[in-house]
């Protein structure tokens, strides 16, 4: 929207063309999203409290979580509002990648919103049934993956890049790409959802990973950089640089209120959509495996649940004291802030490892 205005004004005064630069628009997108989050955060929290939209705390969970009773939830609405408004202001409306991200945000936030609503309505930690949630996520992922395939065929051949091994590129058929995209989207969406159990834990991981994906998007959308770094050049993909910046800004605005002790939780409306957004960005820039590496905390949280359930069904015993993984450490009497910061550190290290692949490329 603002881009059209800039182009119009530039016809009369070329000095305004600086606002058309990708880096400037990205900075403004991040600051705008952050400003919206900070300005509306307190108002939004009070409104949620007035409407009694509070997090339902599991009675079988860590006893330390009982003090969180009454904390407002569905803060993901604030994150997504700041995010979408920001990219609509500073993004290029003619860029198809912008609309893919917006549609992804809306679809998965709708699933999460429904889940949160049912939990609050029935005052239970159970919202949508597992089968319905999985079905809606699956259908959404297939639709989005198909859309990406149709777009990708016009730009580059579907392929799977192997980080740190620039001479290994696996060509993918349309069916292969569809299956890969499906699992990345559904897996990432649920992984962030499982990780969102401690104050600020999931959102900081989203911020760090978004920063790394922004760098990859910037390089992949620049012919000279992508050629020098032996990365696939994808026309127009650098618009994701602005989208990642807006995601960082909106997430920071939310973290301001979600940091320990949290004044608000993002709920499924936030976690399911944020996970899907990260997945779609990674798919678009051909960095699916890097998302798996950089999102190692998300992966560990998910695997802990899968292993716990599978092992218990086979042997009627538990490997972990409680899952997801962060609850296991809570059961060991490690304080919540310490667990959170340690998980942040792990994510930071994994993100740096992911960024190191650029140089190795």
UniProtKB/Swiss-Prot annotation:
GO terms for cellular component: plasma membrane. Pathway: Cell wall biogenesis; peptidoglycan biosynthesis. The keyword Membrane applies. It is found in: Cell inner membrane. Its main location: membrane. Its EC number is 2.7.8.13. Its cofactor is Mg(2+). The chain crosses the membrane at residues 21-41, 69-89, 93-113, 131-151, 168-188, 200-220, 240-260, 264-284, 289-309, 338-358. Keywords: Cell cycle, Cell division, Cell inner membrane, Cell membrane, Cell shape, Cell wall biogenesis/degradation, Magnesium, Membrane, Metal-binding, Peptidoglycan synthesis, Transferase, Transmembrane, Transmembrane helix. GO terms for biological process: cell division; cell wall organization; peptidoglycan biosynthetic process; regulation of cell shape. It comes from the Bacteria. Pfam families: Glycos_transf_4 (PF00953), MraY_sig1 (PF10555). It is a multi-pass membrane protein. Signal peptide: none annotated. GO terms for molecular function: metal ion binding; phospho-N-acetylmuramoyl-pentapeptide-transferase activity; UDP-N-acetylmuramoyl-L-alanyl-D-glutamyl-meso-2,6-diaminopimelyl-D-alanyl-D-alanine:undecaprenyl-phosphate transferase activity. Belongs to the glycosyltransferase 4 family. MraY subfamily. This is Phospho-N-acetylmuramoyl-pentapeptide-transferase.
